[in-house]
């Protein structure tokens, strides 16, 4: 992976050519250069410290640009920083910011803006869903600040001068640069946020440093962007304006696409239409294998899911192959582990032994566990599956509920509960659920982005899973001196999570979507499937 090329045993400044959309010579561009994309939901917020999902990151990456970013294939590229270096122990990282980078109000983008933003992220007063991210990266004092033991000003970041941003970590973190692409580490216009508080995200107040500006927002309908002429690389940008729609229903998404109302669907096509779409729209169906896991989170602190045998029974009696092959059938692969084994340094993670056992044997053991817990046909285990409103999630939930009932001979009785995106996120975070549909996509291509999720003190850990041995295994990954040592620690942590049955992993994601043939610059090869408008262009059609 690209980030291996970034690290040196000596302090070495690394520079990259500026990222830009590549338009082949002789290409006839469309005059309008406007694109309509379905974003899949109404975002929680335009504040990157108040969000945690894909609809939100899709918006954030247009309006704001971090230290580093990525190209259309997911390869690391310079962003607000034009170069960086690290000390031999991988514990001090120095980023040199572009002196021509400006906020959309004309102010320069400085190291002070990054210091302000990163401190705000870990400040308990912010209550950021991703507060733990800087703790994951081992930034000095991050966890103590989150826990209220130290002040945000004590975070291990500094503005050495206006254009030099320095990060100090307590342990070696050789993948620091890769992790800096994440939405939670985007800079904020410190003067604007300090003056306006939470109102800074309103359309009339929004100031960003990204390739686009916020032009309009109609809640639950659309978000409109316009090109930012003050963006440092605006001369290489082609798309002039864009509209993101908030269509949650995949069938409606496809219908609007076929009617010509949008140029790119959200990720996730209706399974029953997939083969037909491949046949009727050759070249327009993209299927991107991503670093993501679809699972059912179990509320580990809520009875009866605080009983490991109940969690085990649910894992045993769910046939993942039925969901991937018969319900979805778009290239998803069944999994019984949370961390994708194909992510960097995840290669030592093994699927559990029961994944290879016949379903009849697994079902028999699940029934025994449920009966021992006091359940029967007359007194079945009853719970609800919470999912965000989406017909594909509903199909998976119906299949899971049916399998759990049939495979345990009526010892499980499941109801379905759907909520719109923002309410669903709030319910999971507040622990108002039994079992919840969950999807986790890599924040960067390295196994810690999954392993850290289930740390006892993780702000992302909505399953409320906690095991000191798991925490210890993840700590060992930071103490490891090489990639193989880290890989062993990740495998150990995953094995502990598996023996605790803390979650029900179901499949590894693919992102199927439709893209009009006149939309260029989308490769379908980015393992995180980020959408950057600055990477796209429209040809004459």
Curated annotation (Swiss-Prot):
Record keywords: Peptide transport, Periplasm, Protein transport, Signal, Transport
Localization annotation: Periplasm
GO molecular function: peptide transmembrane transporter activity
Keyword set includes Transport: yes
Cysteine disulfide links: none
Oligomeric and partner information: The complex is composed of two ATP-binding proteins (OppD and OppF), two transmembrane proteins (OppB and OppC) and a solute-binding protein (OppA).
Primary role: Part of the ABC transporter complex OppABCDF involved in the uptake of oligopeptides. Plays an important nutritional role. Binds peptides containing from two to five amino acid residues.
Name the UniProt record assigns to this protein: Periplasmic oligopeptide-binding protein OppA
Protein species of origin: Haemophilus influenzae (strain ATCC 51907 / DSM 11121 / KW20 / Rd)
Gene name of this polypeptide: oppA
